[in-house]
UniProtKB/Swiss-Prot annotation:
Subcellular location: Nucleus; Cytoplasm; Cytoplasm, Cytoskeleton, Microtubule organizing center, Centrosome
Name the UniProt record assigns to this protein: Terminal nucleotidyltransferase 5C
Its biological purpose: Catalyzes the transfer of one adenosine molecule from an ATP to an mRNA poly(A) tail bearing a 3'-OH terminal group and enhances mRNA stability and gene expression. Can also elongate RNA oligos ending with uridine molecule, provided that the sequence is adenosine-rich. Mainly targets mRNAs encoding endoplasmic reticulum-targeted protein.
Induction: By type I interferons.
Organism encoding this protein: Homo sapiens (Human)
Length: 391
């Protein structure tokens, strides 16, 4: 009975994609995506299909078996529900591989970097370009995680419009989603095999069976949440600090909680985790600025609303922070919001504003200055912990 119950739960997490979804997946995999080089390095024109096939074949040539390849994140959500409110930001690809030692991590990195040589324009002398040079030119972010529960690496390829191509190589990972609507993964192997073996173009009457999985556990429930813009999760205590930023992003896109009572507990968890993972004001500033750059690159008008929602959540749900440190974080969010308005020319830049005011009657000193010239915001240079343990 236990085995049957486990099988039922596993089956609930999978679903077969219909033709409309397979067609959108094909478009995502074959769309040309520019990878912008720094300095004088040329832009690479790639498709996800080509980069996956190149990296996979080179990994297997190097002795690293790829168990499967999946499309993850907002791109997977876009394939399943076209107008879901999340858009299609980073193009996340997951390669399931074994990473038992440091040598495999290094080999994966070198394989990906050398694979980029295939996409350099004709006429470029590839013999003089090293993996280190390619990393400096095209890699936006390089991450390696090795803990008791997580063994994975991430290589993010730069795109100036915020549509980075992210290649994630996973041996094990404790949690692969934050909310039900971002829990989807689409297994690409059958479609990649079709590209390799079929001489006929893909069509409604001639296409492979493609399987999707929800790491949330119930595919149909998560799919309903995505269609109806609902916010739900499981085991919120496991969500990392970035979950607060993702939650505020969902709210600004008109997603709403499935349970108004539970969401207050969730907000407190996320605020506490944010301040644990980003304990000083400089880290918080860097995280917020990077998040805005990566997730609102083409949505300037939404930045201010997003920051105001984030400020409200932090103000109402922070319970593990000392008063002055909470105010410091709220002030940081307000300053970022002010900067956003200034960049949009909705108000003048606060660094160049002259603020006039009428002095109080008791100000009779002839040397009293009746105006104040605003100075640039203070740069926080003394990082220190801004959270207290929850009892």
């Amino acid at each position: 009975m236990a085995e049957e119950s486990s099988c039922t739960r596993d089956c609930m997490s999978f679903s077969v994609l219909n033709w409309d979804q397979v067609s959108r997946l094909h478009e995502v995999l074959t769309e040309v995506v520019p990878i912008h080089g720094r300095g004088n390095f040329p832009t690479l024109e790639i498709t996800l299909k080509d980069i996956v096939q190149t990296v996979r074949s080179r990994l297997e040539e190097a002795g690293i078996k790829v168990h499967d390849v999946r499309l993850n994140g907002s791109a997977a959500g876009h394939v399943l529900v076209k107008d879901n409110g999340l858009g299609c930001k980073d193009l996340d690809l997951i390669f399931h591989v074994a990473l038992p030692t440091e040598a495999e991590f290094q080999l994966v990195r070198d394989v990906v970097l050398c694979s980029l040589l295939n996409f350099l324009p004709e006429g470029v002398n590839k013999l003089k370009i090293s993996p280190v040079t390619l990393k400096e030119a095209y890699v936006q972010k390089l991450v390696k995680v090795c803990t008791d529960t997580d063994r994975w690496s991430l290589i993010s390829l730069s795109n100036k419009n915020g549509k980075n191509v992210e290649l994630k190589f996973v041996d094990s990972i404790r949690r692969q989603f934050e909310f039900s609507v971002d829990s989807f993964q689409i297994i690409l192997d059958s479609l990649l095999f079709f590209y390799d073996c079929s001489n006929n173009p893909i069509s409604e009457h001639f296409h492979p069976t493609v399987i999707g999985e929800s790491m949330y556990g119930d595919f149909e429930e998560a799919f309903d949440h995505l269609q109806n813009r609902l916010i739900a999760t499981k085991n919120p205590e496991e969500i990392r600090g970035g979950g607060l930023l993702k939650y505020s992003n969902l709210l600004v896109r008109d997603f709403r909680p499935t349970d108004q009572e539970e969401i207050k507990t969730l907000e407190r968890y996320m605020c506490s985790r944010f301040f644990i993972d980003f304990p000083d004001i400089l880290e918080q500033q860097r995280k917020l600025e990077t998040y805005l750059q990566n997730h609102f690159a083409e949505e300037e008008r939404s930045k201010y609303d997003y920051l105001m929602i984030l400020r409200r959540v932090v103000n109402e749900s922070t319970v593990c922070l000392m008063g002055h440190e909470r105010r410091q974080t709220l002030n940081l969010i307000s300053l970022l919001a002010l900067r956003v308005l200034a960049e949009q020319n909705i108000i003048p830049s606060a660094t160049n504003v002259t603020c006039y005011y009428q002095p109080a009657p008791y100000v009779s000193d002839g040397n009293f200055s009746n105006y104040y010239v605003a100075h640039p915001p203070v740069t926080y240079s003394q990082p220190y912990p801004t959270w207290l343990p929850c009892n």
